[in-house]
Amino acid sequence: MNIVVCLKQVPDTAEVRIDPVKGTLIREGVPSIINPDDKNALEEALVLKDNYGAHVTVISMGPPQAKNALVEALAMGADEAVLLTDRAFGGADTLATSHTIAAGIKKLKYDIVFAGRQAIDGDTAQVGPEIAEHLGIPQVTYVEKVEVDGDTLKIRKAWEDGYEVVEVKTPVLLTAIKELNVPRYMSVEKIFGAFDKEVKMWTADDIDVDKANLGLKGSPTKVKKSSTKEVKGQGEVIDKPVKEAAAYVVSKLKEEHYI
């Protein structure tokens, strides 16, 4: 069994700031992490490796520093890593990104492709399904459980008010959610060992793709501006006996027409 896991290195949203003039994310000085849903996808691939001897390859698109996410994935237990990095990929929206990653995946052997449900720096949930379309394989999204029976997978797909169980044959793309598992910790030995492993670097010339579909040229959508919500509320400390405090809260709620 060969598994490919799509990873994205994203800024830690707990420390994200917005440039008030440009309306863009300020990434300088902000620590980066593996996108959380992608980490669940990787963990499930590693579970299948533990149980069935699967070979796990991680792939990412990004600048050279995105290699850090792939090294972390190798430390967790991935067998191989590929970074798609080229200035031609810059400015890509979800469509151009999916074109690029799918072209990279086509160079690899795969039975299952895992991706996270969505990235925390965009929240579109588009790249995984788009990759499946470019590869011409079925997809199951919002996956919260995976069972293997030969070349057939039994998948539990989450819905807002329940779940659905589906069976699908490989090859298939699955998008993971946090309920799927708890990602493992890395051992010190594996962390040091990961730095000795090769991360393959592929440019636009290394993949079979129409360059008109890459980067800014291949992106039909443009982000004009990003912003954070302005916090308008204010707190008030009520220093009164319990009954008086309760009456005061009720009066305030009525005053604001909440009750």
Curated annotation (Swiss-Prot):
Cofactor binding notes: Binds 1 FAD per dimer.
SMART domains per record: ETF
Record keyword Signal present: no
GO molecular function, one term: electron transfer activity
Keywords recorded for this protein, A-Z: Electron transport, FAD, Flavoprotein, Transport
Keyword Electron transport in record: yes
Family to which this protein belongs: Belongs to the ETF beta-subunit/FixA family.
Subunit structure: Heterodimer of an alpha and a beta subunit.
The name this protein goes by in its record: Electron transfer flavoprotein subunit beta
Organism per entry: Clostridium acetobutylicum (strain ATCC 824 / DSM 792 / JCM 1419 / IAM 19013 / LMG 5710 / NBRC 13948 / NRRL B-527 / VKM B-1787 / 2291 / W)
Highest classification ranks of the organism: Bacteria, Bacillati, Bacillota, Clostridia, Eubacteriales
